Each structure stands twice: as C-alpha cells, then as structure tokens.
C-alpha cells in the first residue's frame, strides 16, 4: 500500500503579523445585506474568483454511492483493494476512524461533518482532501456521543442535511480536546431540550448529539428557522455568491466561503441547518450586526500565530490565530494554479477548557 505521509510544517510566530497563507485578497469579497430570521442573520458573500470544483466529491456523495468507506480503526479487512497490504490492527479508538476513497475523484471533507454508526458517532475535526483511489487514511475525529462504546452499525453514514452546529464545531477545530467536545455536547443537548420541550425526554434519555438533532421535534424547530432561507439560495445563484457570514443575537460568529457557487450549493442545507440549530440553543435578545461589521469580519485574516499542515501535491491546511478569531483555510494543490477550496472563520477568544466560550456563544 502506498501510504502518503502528512508532512507538517509548523510555524509558531508570536508578535509578528502576517496574512493567512493562500488567503484570498481582502478586497475580493463583498458582503451583501443580511437576511434575518429571529436572532439569526445570514450575510451573503459575493465576488472573488470562480474555480472549477465539479470534480470534488463530497462525503455525502461518496458514502451514498459506496465509493467512500468509513470504518473503525482495526476493521478494514475486506475493505482494502485486493493486493493492498492491510495495516496492523490497533483496535477501535475514540478519536480515530479510517477512510478509503475508492472513487476516481478527490474527496472533500469539512470540519463539523458528522458520521454516524460504529461504536460512537463522530464529528470530523478538520478540513482535508483525500486523493482518488486512496489507501486507508486516518481521520481526525471527535466523539459526539459520550457513554456508548458498542457498535450500533457495521457501516458509517452521514446525518442527512446535518452538520454539527458552530458551538460544537469550535472545540473540535480549536481545542482538539475530547473532553471539551463532550462538555459542549452536554451543554448543547440541555439547551436544545429547553428550545424543543416535547423532545426533552428523548434528548435526556440519550447522550447522542446526532440522535438529538434527528429528533422529529428538534427537526421541526430547526426546519422552521432554516425554511426562511430556502429562497435565498436561488437568489445567491443569480449573483454568484460563494459564502456567508453568520450573526446570532447581533454578534458575528462565523463565516464560510467556498471556491465556487456550486460548492456552496452542495453544503447549503447542512450549513444553514447548523446555524439554525445554534440560533435555537443561543436564544436571547440582541441587536443586529450591521453590514459594515460583517465586511470587516470577513476581511480580517491576519494573525500573530500560524500553523500549516500539508500533504504534498494534495492539500495545504492553514490555521491563523488572530485577536478574537481563528481562520482556517484549505488549499487544493492538485491543480495549477492552487486555489482556496474553503475558508472558515470563527469568532473565538481564549480557551473553552478555561471556561471562556467562543465569542457570540456566551450565555
């Protein structure tokens, strides 16, 4: 088996200021007026170059077609292509899954995507690209179902039209600490039980974030918010939008920008429902962030600490730490010129383990 080694180039520069590697020009993107539903405001992002992304396979597409297989570490026998060696069986691990991309297309994975099944439901911890016809690839994941370590299914799938909401994504992407993720899942489930009282008994009967989000009453509440943005996607196609900036209770918390309108479309339902879920579990009164603030948030991509990880010829992932925010950029190296596939930015200040929550998630 031809293993590709992930070469990590780590730069820790304190006191210096620089732009995130491969970040788009700050003047490229323009934020449009928001569409607001309750305490959730969505600011469309237009402008910037359009790249051909049709060749990128999403996790949903890959699992649905059977071209992508996800399994517990140590359960790969029979899944690897004939003639390929099988790595030693190290047994199932909470923070490790193994993925094989049998397709002819590169696979795009986004932080926050949830895979259900196996011994526990997991959330993917970081963006990455998996090359076509890959051998087994270790995935960095975090459990979002404390308390279960018994196989519910031999196969992994994804939650249909679901992605972990921003408040759950933050500890996985930034803290990278399992206990922090479990703590946030517990808090989120409690808040969701209050937001959807009929679902409270079922939510409290299980520790599963995925099951809670799939509860009919929770689906109804999340869907009622998300439905207000159904028509927005049609308008965004017309103007070639590539991303969105998100505000809850008047606080800007997140931005997602893609390489193409087509890619934004593919993730639209997942993203909108994740923001809607966060608006329900962070319900409070507040003003509305203005358009100028949303534009400023999107433009501030500089920081004083940067971590770069790269798989040569496949992708580069950059994390930039700024004053009150984190920027994550996934760059494709599989074609020339290289290009930014996905940019995610979150408002963030301090450590969740020290009791300081992400900006905009404070209660």
Spans of model-derived segments:
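Positively charged n-region of N-terminal signal peptides that target proteins for export
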Residues: 1-7
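Bacterial N-terminal signal peptides
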Residues: 8-17
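Intrinsically disordered, low-complexity segments enriched in small/polar residues
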Residues: 20-107, 112-363
């Amino acid at each position: 088996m031809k293993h590709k080694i992930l070469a990590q180039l780590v730069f820790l520069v304190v006191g210096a200021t620089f732009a995130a590697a491969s970040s788009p020009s700050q003047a490229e993107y323009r934020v449009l007026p928001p569409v607001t539903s309750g305490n959730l405001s969505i600011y469309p992002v237009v402008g910037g170059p359009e790249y051909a992304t049709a060749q990128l396979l999403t996790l949903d597409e890959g699992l649905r077609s059977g071209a992508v297989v996800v399994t517990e570490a140590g359960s790969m026998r029979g899944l690897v292509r004939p003639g390929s060696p099988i790595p030693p069986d190290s047994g199932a691990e909470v923070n490790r899954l193994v993925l094989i991309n049998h397709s002819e297309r590169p696979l795009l994975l986004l932080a926050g995507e949830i895979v259900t099944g196996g011994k526990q439901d997991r959330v993917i911890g970081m963006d990455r690209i998996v090359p076509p016809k890959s051998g087994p690839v270790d995935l960095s994941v975090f459990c979002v179902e404390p308390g279960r370590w018994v196989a519910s299914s031999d196969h992994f799938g994804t939650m249909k039209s679901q992605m972990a909401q921003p408040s759950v994504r933050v500890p996985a992407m930034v803290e990278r600490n399992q206990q922090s993720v479990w703590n946030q899942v517990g808090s989120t489930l409690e808040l969701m039980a209050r937001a959807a009282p009929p679902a409270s008994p079922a939510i409290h009967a299980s520790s599963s974030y995925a099951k809670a989000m799939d509860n009919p009453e929770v689906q109804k509440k999340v869907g009622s918010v998300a439905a207000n943005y159904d028509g927005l996607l049609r308008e965004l196609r017309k103007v070639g939008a590539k991303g969105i900036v998100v505000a809850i209770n008047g606080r800007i918390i997140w931005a997602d920008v893609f390489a193409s309108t087509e890619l934004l479309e593919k993730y639209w339902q997942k993203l909108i429902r994740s923001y809607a879920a966060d608006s329900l579990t962070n319900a409070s009164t507040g003003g509305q962030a203005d358009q100028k603030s949303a534009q400023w948030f999107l433009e501030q991509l500089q920081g004083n600490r940067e971590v770069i990880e790269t798989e040569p010829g496949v992708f580069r992932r950059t994390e930039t730490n700024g004053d009150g925010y984190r920027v994550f950029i996934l760059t494709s190296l599989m074609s020339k010129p290289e290009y930014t596939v996905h940019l995610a930015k979150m408002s963030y200040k301090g450590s969740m383990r020290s009791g300081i929550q992400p900006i905009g998630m404070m209660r």
